[in-house]
Amino acid sequence: MEKTEHKNTYSFDADASKVLNLVIHSLYRHKDVFLRELISNASDALNKLREASYFDQELLEDNPELEILISLNKEKKILEISDNGIGMDEKELVENLGTVARSGTEKFLESLKDKKVDLIGQFGVGFYSVFMVADKVEVETRKAGTKKGYIWGSRGRDSFYVDELGESVSRGTKIRIYLKDNSEEFLDKFKLEHVVVTNSNHIAFPIYLIDEKGEKDQINSASAIWTKNKTEITDEEHQNFFRDVAHVGGKPWMIIHNKNEGSTEYINLLYVPSIKPFDLYNPDRRASVKLYIKKVFITEENVQLIPQYLRFLKGVVDCADLPLNISRETLQYNNALVKIKKSLTNRVLNELKKRADSNPEEYISGFWNNFGAVLKEGLCEAMPTDERERLFALCRFYSLKKEKLISLDEYIQDMHPEQKEIYCLCSTSFESAKNSPQLEGFVSRGLDVLFFTDPVDDFWISVSHEYKSYNIKSITRSSIDLDAFAELEKAGQEVQQHHDKEIDRLIAKMQEVLKDEVESVRISKRLTESPVCLAVPDGAMDIRMEKFMLEQKQLHSRSKKILEINASHPVIGKIIGKVDSPEVEDLIFLLYDQACILQGDEVRNPVRMSKALTRLLLMT
């Protein structure tokens, strides 16, 4: 910075002019942020005075109520932001506003590094964002404890001036903004209120808006309830804040309020709603956890404070410090964010586990029925084994035997002594699952099966297929082995026996007829009441997942399944007697189509099925 011939006029040096031009024209995406930056600076000034007044009460003079004022003059197109904070003397005014990208706050922090003070102006360029909307800016200021005031002025180009104002200036700083023609929107009272409430609602000092009639209204809450001790927050305060951040009805089902004082300092106040948002499964749904830095709103976009599978959470995370880009609009990726995300995830999973253990029924009705499917999305992601196990422990699945939702731990506790796997069945609904022929062999042996009926189940089961050393296995798999489990005795059950040669002839015939449809035909060990079912070869996609992939054009053709037949079923007995008859092919195709329908697979040739059925009906 070089002083010109005029004793009170200064020019920005060449590098500073470049930075200033960048700030005005390129740095910020939204013009609104200038107001956030100026309010943040005002908050810093008030904090400085409050801290300094602990040692010298006279600095408060006769004006101890610390506040920020915003006033407007539509006729002259002037917007003013003022505070009664620490203020600046001539030297500080020249240094702090005359040097772009140099922070007065940084110097003040150095002088008070051993004392706790809350300052949010980190970068020294935020002030200059005002020139996005201003033709000219004037700053009137008087430092607390001094008598002389000064004025700084600039058009945001190459120079600025500083003049003495005498002793008539109030303590603090007043910024007078002469708005550009394209920025007159900031003379609208409702626009100003919206910007302040969005970005600076929780600044610790009251912000008043003074309209042209001189009416003074406080437009911020001047309180960040998350900074209070959790025992000091009333139910009404929680309800009001939840309503503001969640934008959903009802009360919060669970509140998670913690302060982390480790290497990364932050406070979280998170809510789990009691009502499922209508857009929960919208892929474009925005995150609902807002990031603050020292009570100043930063963003709720492009920051992953929580994993996607916890997107039902609402609330705030307030950090002591995080590296932002120079505009404070976006975060720089760093290890602190990773630590915060991991810590928050652990805390939320722990709190959910406590509720699930202490009140299982209320956990299912209040949480799982609303957000269980979203939580299971996490099982599709790559994550540490311990996190996956904790996520599994929160899951609830419908039990065939108990006819209710249970945990995997409950399932394991009641497993057959010889059982080494957790058996499951993916289906579109409870009713279709209950009627699946695949269940028959498990029911006859007293084995429990879990029903997976959410669409997401088809995805995670191929990724997360083990819990506490137990494989989670679909009962549709061809490798399911039930030989180790004895069937329960059924009184009065008649079993039709056939010679091996007769069965072998039928299987050979079926494989010949269905050579283009199935991989193989074999005798089933799982069927007791149905004549046929389909089994999925190991390594192949589950039927429902394959159907989805075909619908999404991710697969071009269906895989061949294994057709299992119940050798003791009367229908199979009749077909054995007709293995050499002309209608045997129609019977075989109908059996295959029946198996497809029962397991949710499409009938590949409905015309063939219709004709075969018609021919057989004509024969009766």
UniProtKB/Swiss-Prot annotation:
It holds the Pfam family HSP90. InterPro entries: HATPase_C_sf, Heat_shock_protein_90_CS, HSP90_C, Hsp90_fam, Hsp90_N, Ribosomal_Su5_D2-typ_SF. Transmembrane segments: none annotated. Residues 548-620 are annotated as: C. The keyword ATP-binding applies. The keyword Flavoprotein does not apply. It is found in: Cytoplasm. CDD domains: HATPase_Hsp90-like. GO terms for cellular component: cytoplasm. Residues 329-547 are annotated as: B. One of its GO terms (molecular function) is ATP binding. Residues 1-328 are annotated as: A. It comes from the Bacteria. Keywords: ATP-binding, Chaperone, Cytoplasm, Nucleotide-binding, Stress response. Its main location: cytoplasm. Belongs to the heat shock protein 90 family. Homodimer. NCBIfam families: PRK05218.1 (NF003555). Molecular chaperone. Has ATPase activity. PANTHER family: HEAT SHOCK PROTEIN 90 FAMILY MEMBER. This is Chaperone protein HtpG. It comes from Neorickettsia sennetsu (strain ATCC VR-367 / Miyayama) (Ehrlichia sennetsu).
